[in-house]
Amino acid sequence: MAVARKIRTLLTVNILVFVGIVLFSVYCRLQGRSQELVRPLSGGCRPRPATPAPGSPLRSGGPRAVVAGRAELVLKGQLPAEPCSPGRLMVPEAEAEAQGGLAATLRDDGQEAEGKYEEYGYNAQLSDRISLDRSIPDYRPRKCRHMSYAQDLPQVSVVFIFVNEALSVILRSVHSVVNHTPSQLLKEVILVDDNSDNVELKFNLDQYVNKRYPGLVKIVRNSRREGLIRARLQGWKAATAPVVGFFDAHVEFNTGWAEPALSRIREDRRRIVLPAIDNIKYSTFEVQQYANAAHGYNWGLWCMYIIPPQDWLDRGDESAPIRTPAMIGCSFVVDREYFGDIGLLDPGMEVYGGENVELGMRVWQCGGSMEVLPCSRVAHIERTRKPYNNDIDYYAKRNALRAAEVWMDDFKSHVYMAWNIPMTNPGVDFGDVSERLALRQRLKCRSFKWYLENVYPEMRIYNNTLTYGEVRNSKASGYCLDQGAEDGDRAILYPCHGMSSQLVRYSADGLLQLGPLGSTAFLPDSKCLVDDGRGRTPTLRKCEDVARPTQRLWDFTQSGPIVSRATGRCLEVEMSKDANFGLRLVVQRCSGQKWMIRNWIKHARH
């Protein structure tokens, strides 16, 4: 009996010892991981570095002269972690390669790196090995480097929005803005966490910024995922400086970015300033210069870079501000009070997409202006994967319709056309816009026609469109007229899917055009369906390239034939074993086939 008790006691002791070892190991791993980011810098912590002298390496974009301290070196993998932690591979060459914005690589770029690519949309493992204080090239026009600014510029609150971002990328954004903004101008840095799932972005981030930048960096945490638009509104509410800069949390700032932006806003508080954007390559973190550009959009309200306006090109001064109709959205700087006066961002929009275009329309139509500033530059990672990817097309469509209904007057039909959806019962609930309409009335804003004529004259106008959408034939109702290959010249029949390749427009002039709207003078327009009379196959050509204009003209009524004005032949469908889906488009003697188009605009726009 006594022997049995001794055996049970020994077993219990052994089990407790084993459990203790496991728990201690876990504790050490967690503690080591935490200490990688929160250990104080050698020599003690300071709230922030002093403003560099004009000739210092930091001021000119060179590397910091001060050794970073153990915490940063552990983060970069240049020193082992604490003895009981998992440790990291030492790869000092990654930091050396990345200095000056050059491309960097890792020799151990294996399965772990691939997993991080998938998670973040960029090479997060490489980012962990690159200095938080690395230098990047000064891509400002030469004239910018010799400009001087007033001493009493307003202070700025810099707001970063993130959700499930790599910690080292967030910290590099913070280090970069602190390093490249004069201390008297930077009031605070506000990090808005849009309800990240990543545990590393909670305790580790808090401890790091509280120790490294006490009192300078604030963290705002959303209790639920709000999306980029409403997360920015939270940042605006938390900001206390007279000017607020909104940025993605995967950027690096160039030397002298703040002074020109703040100077332009000081001159006119109704001016929204967009730093010029350069690119950080997602795979190697190489910083690549982008050409100076304005920010435009197509009729679907997707933003894009466009050529600067002709008057800017004629001026011949690369440092001059560039008038821009809208903004890409990853960075903008605005007077805090003015931003509130004009209605912030539309809180009824979801996630992101369209809010950047809507803001451009609103600012211009309501008496303000928007410009890209080549002397103020920010490098930005264009990620291959974004955290809000689920259903982003739906949200972008919904947001576009909200903007169209409030700001675009009769031109809102162009947005419905671009998305290939009906104007009545579009299948998208864009919510109540009454408050935004009241805002427009209260601000006494101009018409969208004024905006197109004075701010975005490059937009193509489709006011003479009578009808648009999917076109089906009575002989094959499940198939739609389709532009076929983008670079081809043959229209086809294809199972109906409602995408832009099946957008057909019939104009008051008699043009039948297939494919996505060309939207601006910078993009090719949709092609015309042509019957040249030389064969039975209709072709697609650029409308302006058709030799005889009547060859591109058709007569069409709902549930009736489509008849060529040049030949009197009808566009019809014939069965053919050699054709895709056994259906071929032909022009031939009319046999009574009928065509139906989905959406009608009741009268031509003038």
From Swiss-Prot:
It comes from the Eukaryota. PROSITE patterns: RICIN_B_LECTIN. Disulfide bonds join C144-C375, C366-C445, C480-C496, C528-C543, C570-C590. One of its GO terms (biological process) is protein O-linked glycosylation. Substrate binds at D194, R225, R383, Y388. It catalyses: L-seryl-[protein] + UDP-N-acetyl-alpha-D-galactosamine = a 3-O-[N-acetyl-alpha-D-galactosaminyl]-L-seryl-[protein] + UDP + H(+); L-threonyl-[protein] + UDP-N-acetyl-alpha-D-galactosamine = a 3-O-[N-acetyl-alpha-D-galactosaminyl]-L-threonyl-[protein] + UDP + H(+). Pathway: Protein modification; protein glycosylation. Residues 467-603 form the Ricin B-type lectin domain. Residues 30-606 are lumenal. Mn(2+) binds at D248, H250, H380. Residues 43-62 are annotated as: Disordered. It is a single-pass type II membrane protein. One of its GO terms (molecular function) is metal ion binding. The chain crosses the membrane at residues 7-29. Keywords: Disulfide bond, Glycoprotein, Glycosyltransferase, Golgi apparatus, Lectin, Manganese, Membrane, Metal-binding, Signal-anchor, Transferase, Transmembrane, Transmembrane helix. GO terms for cellular component: Golgi membrane. InterPro entries: GalNAc-T, Glyco_trans_2-like, Nucleotide-diphossugar_trans, Ricin_B-like_lectins, Ricin_B_lectin. Its EC number is 2.4.1.41. It holds the Pfam family Glycos_transf_2. It is found in: Golgi apparatus membrane. PANTHER family: N-ACETYLGALACTOSAMINYLTRANSFERASE (PTHR11675), POLYPEPTIDE N-ACETYLGALACTOSAMINYLTRANSFERASE 9 (PTHR11675:SF28). Catalyzes the initial reaction in O-linked oligosaccharide biosynthesis, the transfer of an N-acetyl-D-galactosamine residue to a serine or threonine residue on the protein receptor. Does not glycosylate apomucin or SDC3. There are two conserved domains in the glycosyltransferase region: the N-terminal domain (domain A, also called GT1 motif), which is probably involved in manganese coordination and substrate binding and the C-terminal domain (domain B, also called Gal/GalNAc-T motif), which is probably involved in catalytic reaction and UDP-Gal binding. Belongs to the glycosyltransferase 2 family. GalNAc-T subfamily. This is Polypeptide N-acetylgalactosaminyltransferase 9. It comes from Macaca fascicularis. The lineage of its organism: Eukaryota, Metazoa, Chordata, Craniata, Vertebrata.
